[in-house]
């Protein structure tokens, strides 16, 4: 990792159907081997299922799920005099979003439903209702930070 220049942020184009930048980032995270059309199909089909089952706006469910999964605080390792401490630190907004997206996708891939569309729609609905593995991951992260609160003065 270069110390001279920080990488410049790339412009993310909003998705075609909803015109949302965060949704594009979500699709890009789902995508394998550059197959964006497959990722788009998975997300849009999952949104259709959410619309049928929840009878609400799927983008609202998606945003609520992201909000419920995003961590406010996490632990980072810090070495002090031969000992490694887990120091709780606040999470930047961009990282919160990235972690929430990653955790939702990981939780969806770990589910036992038949297709990725079913898994993703179920995980998004669960996350929007404060259930599911992605929310559990956030709770674990917060619990870990709370347990290591004594080391918060090592913050950098």
Swiss-Prot record:
SS bonds (residue pairs): none
Keywords: Ribonucleoprotein, Ribosomal protein, RNA-binding, rRNA-binding, tRNA-binding
Keyword Membrane: no
GO BP annotations, alphabetical order: translation
GO-annotated cellular components: small ribosomal subunit
SUPFAM superfamilies according to UniProt: Ribosomal protein S7
Pfam families xref list: Ribosomal_S7
Gene Ontology molecular function, alphabetical: rRNA binding; structural constituent of ribosome; tRNA binding
Assembly mode: Part of the 30S ribosomal subunit. Contacts proteins S9 and S11.
Family label: Belongs to the universal ribosomal protein uS7 family.
Record function comment: One of the primary rRNA binding proteins, it binds directly to 16S rRNA where it nucleates assembly of the head domain of the 30S subunit. Is located at the subunit interface close to the decoding center, probably blocks exit of the E-site tRNA.
Record protein name field: Small ribosomal subunit protein uS7
Species this chain originates from: Methylocella silvestris (strain DSM 15510 / CIP 108128 / LMG 27833 / NCIMB 13906 / BL2)
